[in-house]
Each structure stands twice: as C-alpha cells, then as structure tokens.
C-alpha cells in the first residue's frame, strides 16, 4: 500500500527521486499518466489496467469510451525506476501540467500522485474551504 505525503525536487534533467518507502513497493515497469486533475499519476501495470477497465465500464456511450481512451492512452508512458530510485518525467507531461521543480508526491493506496507544490497547496486550500 502506498501512502504519505513527500516533498521532493526534480533535477535539471527532469528526474524525480521517489521516496524509498514508496519505490520499494513498486516494480518496473511503472506507468506515468496525466491524472484527472492538475497532477501526474504513477501506477503499477496491474493496477493501471484495472483502473482503466473500471473507468471504461462506467461509460455506456461508445464515443465517450473512445474519447476517454484517447485521453488516457495518449498521455501515458511506460517508465522505469533507475538504480538511484529516480524516474524521468517526459517534458510534454511536465509542460502540459505546468509542473515545477518543487513537487509533492502523494501515496494514495494503489497509486502515487505528483503535484506541483504550488498547485497542490492551492488545491488543498480549496478543499479545506469547501469542507469547512
């Protein structure tokens, strides 16, 4: 199980070191994809495929299924964790989500989320405001 919040920095080569507690629970390859919010998600292969099936099963319209498949598959890359526990995040994913050097890595049970530090702080503030 993946859990916790970790603050990390991407290096100049767009590599991000995953916390040891989290990377020890993941095995290569892993899947990096755009989340449904302003984040990136990291999945194991089995959990990623299961999640896609669940999303697609909730949709009855064939066009909507194709549209969701396009979004998911075209924004997903298979990556590996190197010997130092780093992943390389493709530039197009960083750019499309405006992810900055400073990030939060969130463990959310079966996946990780990577958020720009500023965006996550703003998102968290909005959530707390909505629930107070």
From Swiss-Prot:
Domain SpoVT-AbrB: 5-47, 76-119
Keyword Signal: no
Gene Ontology process terms (BP): negative regulation of DNA-templated transcription initiation
Key words of the record: Cytoplasm, DNA-binding, Repeat, Transcription, Transcription regulation
InterPro entries assigned: MraZ, MraZ_C, MraZ_dom, MraZ_N, MraZ_sf, SpoVT-AbrB_dom, SpoVT-AbrB_sf
Subcellular location(s) of the protein: Cytoplasm, Nucleoid
Main location: cytoplasm
Keyword Plastid: no
One Gene Ontology cellular component: nucleoid
Molecular function GO terms recorded: DNA-binding transcription factor activity; transcription cis-regulatory region binding
Subunit structure: Forms oligomers.
Family (UniProt): Belongs to the MraZ family.
Protein name (record): Transcriptional regulator MraZ
């Amino acid at each position: 199980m993946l859990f916790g919040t970790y603050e990390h920095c991407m290096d100049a080569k767009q590599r991000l070191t995953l916390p040891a507690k989290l990377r020890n629970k993941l095995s290569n390859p892993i899947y990096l994809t755009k989340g449904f919010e302003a984040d990136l998600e990291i999945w194991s292969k089995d959990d990623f495929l299961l999640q896609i099936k669940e999303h697609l099963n909730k949709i009855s319209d064939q066009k909507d299924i194709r549209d969701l498949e396009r979004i998911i598959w075209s924004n997903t890359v298979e990556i590996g964790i190197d010997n130092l526990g780093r992943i390389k995040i493709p530039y197009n994913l960083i750019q499309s989500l405006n992810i900055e050097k400073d990030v939060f890595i969130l463990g959310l049970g079966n996946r990780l989320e990577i958020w720009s530090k500023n965006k996550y702080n703003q998102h968290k503030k909005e959530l707390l405001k909505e629930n107070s």
